[in-house]
Amino acid sequence: LPAGGVLFDTLNFNTDGIPGVNTLIIEANPIDTITFQYDQAEQYHFNNIAHLRFLIQDDRENPMLDVTFDGLHILDGDVVSARPEILVNLDDENTTLLLDSPGDTIHFKVFLTDPSNVTRRIYFRDGALDIMQFTPANGPSNISKIMYRPVFAQDGNYTLTVQASDISRNQSGDNDYKVSFEVINKPTITEVLNYPNPFTTSTRFVFTLTGQQPPTYMKIQIMTVSGRVVREIDMSELGPVRVGRNISEFAWDGTDQFGDKLARGVYLYH
């Protein structure tokens, strides 16, 4: 470097695991540790050394955990499919420490308590068999996912517990995610009602389905007290249905099959 010259350089280094105040020491024309000679002779060397203090912010934010059954958030005690699709999402605000490695499965623990009250951990693999599928974060967001597709052959009440943390070991919350649910393998439709009842403008239908999958055929008939069918509502009108509790997207407005307003009074449905 000639007298009065300037040299610009860029140094990249990993700051993982060193949160807090750090010091970067930079030395120009350092001594050769083998020959104990400088590359260039200088009258003074003390001004060739710089100490730069810098702060690395510690990651203390908790990641957000989200669990859905067949695309929906369930409540304690809900009925679910005997073959549900359980999706676990872990969303971390830190986009520099991505959960982007297959080895990041160590940041998840999933437990299942069966109707016999036996709790066991669910691992990602059982020998050569994949039990849960892990999708790493791929940026720019830091969202990793677990897909779990169990088969619940035994009827009864289950409890799912999920623990998760980010790269910095921040837990997803003070408490584990825990939800209890019921499985009934036999296909049934129960707890059918309409709400509100009575109604003035429209009413929706509420019902609970059990089994492994939603029915392929379903119809609601509305009749007079004498048994005459005045309105039929098929699945295309009802909207999406699933195993578990349902409330129809369709709202009946008190009209017959031709759109004519029915007389006030009591009607039956099945």
Regions found by a protein language model. Name each.
Residues 1-186:
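Extracellular/luminal regions of secreted and cell-surface proteins that mediate adhesion/ECM remodeling
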Residues 17, 92-94, 168, 199, ...:
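Short, acidic/polar linear motifs in exposed loop/turn regions
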Residues 21-25, 85, 157-161, 204, ...:
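Short, conserved beta-strand segments of beta-strand-rich sandwich/propeller modules, principally
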Residues 86-92, 203-211, 252:
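Aromatic/hydrophobic beta-strand junction motif of beta-rich domains
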Residues 108-110, 162, 219-221, 252, ...:
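Generic short beta-strand
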Residues 153-159, 235-270:
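Short, surface-exposed loop/turn motifs with a glycine/proline- and acidic-biased composition
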Residues 177-185, 192, 260-270:
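C-terminal tail/sorting-segment detector
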Residues 180-195, 199-226, 232-236, 248:
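Glycine-centered coil/turn sites that cap beta-strands in beta-rich domains
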